[in-house]
């Protein structure tokens, strides 16, 4: 494909226009009085959302150079979302401000490399000072962080706080759609482990990059599965019943994995494969725990069992299973509660008998996974559009509270960033000079952007609010339009969220400042209407030959005429 090249100021200007297009769409959502954004969908009703990363992912610009700028800011939002789960809008607003200031200085003749060094020194100092300002989570802080992260929704804050109380901050909390209008909390049997899908082609939800099945069956084995012939009997059986199947094995690879992927993508099977957790004997114990939780049987060579003879009676059953790139969460059915309690009692007896600290740690982990259960927040709303928006808010609140437990809390509303800017002023004036000093000042000026935008979204003059915040040394409460101690008022941010927003914004902005050339694909011209002899559908006559796909890959000899 032919390429388009853009150099120097032209390239940077195009990138900045793309950055602004995306950031201006996202920034209207920040703060408790942030606005909603309506997203057109190819099918069904439009979505109304208040979630920065969801909006960012939807934006695609006509100009190829501007689109690259938008994609770079999408990367900021996605990286912050992946690592912190929240703070995507803050990161986007910070990055936009830094890019604007940085490119303005480059155009005025500043050295891009020195600017970048200054920006990197600034963020290093900010991270140190942020850690000193951070306070440990205590009292009502989890409720407050969840409320702030969900846009001031008190019910969401209460629900997340209650869920963490019931299964602990390290426990498994999932969000699902309710069949009623009410949002409810339920604690049920379940567990999570740190293994994800064997192939991204198993994903069922492209937006969230997860594979999720309701009322699925589990095939548990400590064997490596390479040949599809091992799976033929059980797959044939499930193809008839239509039940989803998740295979948890030492490894699913080669022909077996390829066949599962093809048949899943063609809609022949609802299936996914996951690597079993842990290693060696601990893997066998982990599989046995999952078997007890789900009422299944581990297909093990130690017990002279083979995959070819597996029946549906050997499979575990779950209410729901959610598989991401790195983690799997099982929500079990309640029928196996007695067996789970007996299994926990057995592990506790092992715990009493061992002298090894390492073994005790691993046994305690198993007890926590089995006995802790899963808190399920069932989200209800009058319409599907509101339901999706509410679900996104609850997921943000959950992620923010987990981040708060990890690294603590700081004052919210952009107040902490504004306070940190004072330290950068000293760094710039006392330790640096030239363009490195300018780089520090770029970051310093950008730190007021989130608080300014929160004020604008609340209908106030952003510059006036920033000036008053600095004069009074207080934060701006956008809900009541008053100036107060936001930490004391319970308007909090997770330290980890603020830290990652800063680091990701500086990372992208400093790279854009040092850009001198942009290379983009040249858009292909649209095909002329009626090309092909006047009949635009004329070339499709040859598709009649697809009637021969009944055999789907030639596996009829294995008793699977309908599969690949």
Curated annotation (Swiss-Prot):
It is an enzyme of class 5 (isomerase). Residues 530-541 have a biased composition (Gly residues). It catalyses: ATP + H2O + a folded polypeptide = ADP + phosphate + an unfolded polypeptide. One of its GO terms (molecular function) is isomerase activity. It is found in: Cytoplasm. Residues 521-541 are annotated as: Disordered. InterPro entries: Chaperonin_Cpn60_CS, Cpn60/GroEL, Cpn60/GroEL/TCP-1, GroEL-like_apical_dom_sf, GROEL-like_equatorial_sf, TCP-1-like_intermed_sf. GO terms for cellular component: cytoplasm. Its main location: cytoplasm. ATP binds at residues 29-32, 86-90, 413, 493. One of its GO terms (biological process) is protein refolding. Its EC number is 5.6.1.7. Keywords: ATP-binding, Chaperone, Cytoplasm, Isomerase, Nucleotide-binding. Belongs to the chaperonin (HSP60) family. NCBIfam families: GroEL (TIGR02348), PRK00013.1 (NF000592), PRK12849.1 (NF009487), PRK12850.1 (NF009488), PRK12851.1 (NF009489). HAMAP family: CH60. Together with its co-chaperonin GroES, plays an essential role in assisting protein folding. The GroEL-GroES system forms a nano-cage that allows encapsulation of the non-native substrate proteins and provides a physical environment optimized to promote and accelerate protein folding. Forms a cylinder of 14 subunits composed of two heptameric rings stacked back-to-back. Interacts with the co-chaperonin GroES. This is Chaperonin GroEL 2. The gene is groEL2.
